[in-house]
Amino acid sequence: MAAAGAFRLRRAASALLLRSPRLPARELSAPARLYHKKVVDHYENPRNVGSLDKTSKNVGTGLVGAPACGDVMKLQIQVDEKGKIVDARFKTFGCGSAIASSSLATEWVKGKTVEEALTIKNTDIAKELCLPPVKLHCSMLAEDAIKAALADYKLKQEPKKGEAEKK
């Protein structure tokens, strides 16, 4: 209940800072100016929030964190039998830039093959979201989460010791 209240308070504060008719754009506070409209959009309307069944063989899970700022990101991918990512979900505890980076990453991996998803770089995420230099670590978390999820998926595809000996 307290988390929901805090979320509503943050959303209301950001709405006031970003859309108040009494505050022209040039007079926005410093924190509001740090976030590009793309970050605000992904923060206020995050895409693909949630979880997939981590025990499923076709789901890869990546869990990464940044000790410097306390951000934690879980990103999951679901891959079909042809090696194409058909779904992606995330849960992130962190700032607006971390949430936006996670949201964008899930959008970008969907429809890609496992190998294509490996080419997504933090610099591309940072550029798309117009992240300031002090928030680049958030895009790095997203790249690391993608790589960790892909590695987990690939590990699940390897035959188990007992299965390999039976064949």
Swiss-Prot record:
Changing residue 14 to A: Loss of phosphorylation. Does not affect phosphorylation. Changing residue 71 to A: Stabilizes the D-state. The record marks 35 as: Mediates ISCU dimerization and de novo [2Fe-2S] cluster assembly. The modification Phosphoserine is found at residue 14. GO terms for molecular function: 2 iron, 2 sulfur cluster binding; ferrous iron binding; iron ion binding; iron-sulfur cluster chaperone activity; molecular adaptor activity; protein homodimerization activity; zinc ion binding. Keywords: Cytoplasm, Iron, Metal-binding, Mitochondrion, Nucleus, Phosphoprotein, Transit peptide. It comes from the Eukaryota. Gene3D superfamilies: 3.90.1010.10. Changing residue 140 to I: Does not affect the SDA complex formation. Abolishes desulfurase activity of SDA complex when zinc ion is bound. Activated by FXN when component of SDAU complex. Changing residue 138 to S: Loss of iron-based stimulation of the cysteine desulfurase activity in the presence of FXN. Detected in heart, liver, skeletal muscle, brain, pancreas, kidney, lung and placenta. GO terms for biological process: [2Fe-2S] cluster assembly; [4Fe-4S] cluster assembly; intracellular iron ion homeostasis; iron-sulfur cluster assembly; negative regulation of iron ion import across plasma membrane; positive regulation of mitochondrial electron transport, NADH to ubiquinone. GO terms for cellular component: cytoplasm; cytosol; iron-sulfur cluster assembly complex; mitochondrial [2Fe-2S] assembly complex; mitochondrial matrix; mitochondrion; nucleus. Residues 1-34 form a transit peptide. Phosphorylation at Ser-14 is required for ISCU protein stabilization in the cytosol, whereas dephosphorylation of Ser-14, due to the inhibition of mTORC1 (mammalian target of rapamycin complex 1) complex, leads to degradation of the precursor form and ultimately to a decrease in the mitochondrial mature form. Cysteine persulfide is reduced by thiol-containing molecules such as glutathione and L-cysteine. InterPro entries: ISCU (IPR011339), NIF_FeS_clus_asmbl_NifU_N (IPR002871). The keyword Metal-binding applies. The active site is at residues 69, 138. Belongs to the NifU family. It is linked to Myopathy with exercise intolerance Swedish type: Autosomal recessive metabolic disease characterized by lifelong severe exercise intolerance, in which minor exertion causes fatigue of active muscles, shortness of breath, and cardiac palpitations in association with lactic acidosis. The biochemical phenotype is characterized by a deficiency in mitochondrial iron-sulfur proteins and impaired muscle oxidative metabolism. This is Iron-sulfur cluster assembly enzyme ISCU. The lineage of its organism: Eukaryota, Metazoa, Chordata, Craniata, Vertebrata.
